[in-house]
Amino acid sequence: MKNQAFNSILLDISTHLSQTKNSVEEGIQWVCETLKNNLTAYQWVGFYFAEPITKTLHLKAYAGAPTDHTVIPFGKGICGQVALSNAPFVVPDVTLQDNYIACSVDVRSEIVVPLFLEEKNIGQIDIDSHQPDPFDEEDTQFLEAICKLIADTYGNALLEI
């Protein structure tokens, strides 16, 4: 059932991105809103992009409650760890995670998947859930497909946001 929903949403995102001439910012904002509005476990969805010189991640689009964490140093929190590891990171229970930056007291779990452009980690998608342990390998594969679609759609323009 989850996979069927993911396939439908991925098709909607692919169609929207290919048929509209949105800016990168508008496109990734639309993706954030689409995921948050269509997947009950995705209470907060955001895209962070890397600034290699300062070794920081910068929040460029999100859907959900506002956050104070708009700039995250590499290595700090789940997002910062993914900036260094280049690998997806699923946290079933954030209360058990040592290197965790709390965005909201309501967050129970998190998944972060890197966004690659020409095999370089340029950013990531970050999902927070108020449910414990809702993310699995299907979520990881789905979010990897979304990141690839965004990289394929916008290419080097992603480096300019």
At which residue positions do the language-model features occur?
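Regulatory sensory and allosteric helical modules in signal-transduction proteins
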Residues: F49-T56, K60-A102
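A short, aliphatic-rich beta-strand micro-motif
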Residues: S109-F116
